């Protein structure tokens, strides 16, 4: 049997009422592509697996339904990579399904033999994305350049918005970090950008389709209210990796320390405050873990972020009004 052009890895859990909608969307988006669907269940207690299997059979689609009970999302995605037979791989997260992009990505992959493909965040980026792939005059950006763009929000750092060569992942032994519940996708994208020799930005604006995405509860119990700070731990591991392997890229390291990490911490603080967690409790936890020392301000810290950090640090009672 000829290997498919694309393996679509879909981690699912307890979405029996929407799984067929998700698969139907993907069926329409890949109707002109040789594709296999790898639906990996994380231990659903409903009929998600049965519904998915029935959909594949009724529509005569190439694919498998597997169960990885007890595994986190990273473990499920890694299992998908191991089973994937496609020349290229993409990851689809039901809670954020992007508007049709796979056909354009596969077309670009064939034209360029790119190892890692990603889209555009804004309309004005489309022209340059096209020019970079066709013109030798336009500056070709490196993986380090694109990581800087990720940190400054110029591109989307989402593993659910990329297409990557299967062989590239196997050759470079790139996997999702199974020790992290947060930030695993971003960490994966960093690794791909840094390892790939052939990158391609596709002239497609990546937009989440809210109607087709599956709304899932993300509520945390009181005992793990500070669990989002795991994302900071993941970023610290990434920082250590960058410092060891790419210390000569000083601007990227400083952007990571002076913008990425502080910004992430402040976003976590905002989320906790919205959940009515007391500022004193947050500050106490941060001090205990040493996260307060990571709120570094420097030349690469945006002005608005400086204001947020300063207010939180010295005037926490007024922080909600920043």
Provide a role label for each language-model segment.
Residues 89:
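Short aromatic/hydrophobic "clamp" motif used to bind/position activated sugar donors
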Residues 73, 96-202, 207-226:
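Donor-binding/catalytic cores of nucleotide-activated saccharide
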Residues 111-114, 272-322:
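Membrane-interface aromatic/basic loop that binds lipid-linked glycans or pyrophosphate carriers
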Residues 14-29:
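Short, well-formed alpha-helical segments that are part of the catalytic scaffolds
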Residues 204-248, 267, 274-293:
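Catalytic core of nucleotide-sugar-dependent glycosyltransferases
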Residues 5-7, 36, 187:
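Cell-envelope/extracellular polymer assembly enzymes that use nucleotide-activated donors
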Residues 41-50:
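A conserved acidic beta->alpha catalytic loop
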Residues 68-84:
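Glycine-rich, basic loop-to-helix element that forms the pyrophosphate-binding segment
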């Amino acid at each position: 049997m000829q290997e498919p052009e694309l393996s679509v890895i879909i981690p699912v859990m307890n979405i029996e009422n929407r799984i067929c909608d998700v698969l139907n969307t993907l069926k329409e988006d890949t109707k002109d592509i040789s594709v296999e669907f790898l639906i990996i269940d994380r231990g659903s207690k409903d009929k998600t697996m049965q519904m998915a299997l029935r959909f594949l059979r009724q529509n005569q689609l190439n694919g498998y339904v597997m169960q990885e009970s007890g595994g986190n999302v990273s473990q499920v995605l890694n299992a998908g990579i191991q089973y994937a037979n496609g020349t290229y791989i993409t990851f689809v997260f039901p809670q954020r399904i992007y508007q049709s992009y796979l056909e354009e990505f596969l077309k670009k992959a064939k034209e360029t033999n790119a190892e890692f493909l990603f889209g555009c965040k804004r309309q004005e980026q489309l022209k340059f994305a096209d020019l970079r792939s066709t013109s030798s005059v336009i500056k070709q950006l490196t993986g380090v350049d694109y990581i800087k763009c990720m940190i400054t929000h110029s591109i989307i750092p989402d593993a659910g918005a990329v297409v990557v060569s299967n062989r590239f992942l196997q050759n470079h032994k790139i996997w999702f970090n199974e020790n992290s519940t947060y930030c695993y996708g971003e960490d994966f994208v960093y690794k791909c950008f840094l390892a790939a020799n052939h990158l391609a930005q596709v002239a497609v604006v990546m937009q989440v389709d809210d109607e087709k995405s599956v709304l899932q509860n993300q509520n945390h119990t009181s005992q793990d209210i500070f669990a989002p700070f795991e994302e900071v731990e993941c970023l610290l591991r990434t920082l250590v990796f960058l410092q060891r392997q790419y210390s000569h890229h000083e601007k990227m390291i400083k952007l990571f320390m002076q913008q990425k990490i502080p910004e992430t911490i402040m976003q976590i603080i905002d989320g906790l405050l919205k959940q009515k967690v007391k500022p004193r409790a947050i500050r106490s936890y941060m001090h205990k873990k040493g996260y307060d020392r990571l709120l570094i301000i420097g030349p690469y810290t945006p002005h608005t972020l400086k204001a947020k950090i300063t207010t939180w640090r010295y005037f926490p009672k007024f922080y909600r009004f920043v």
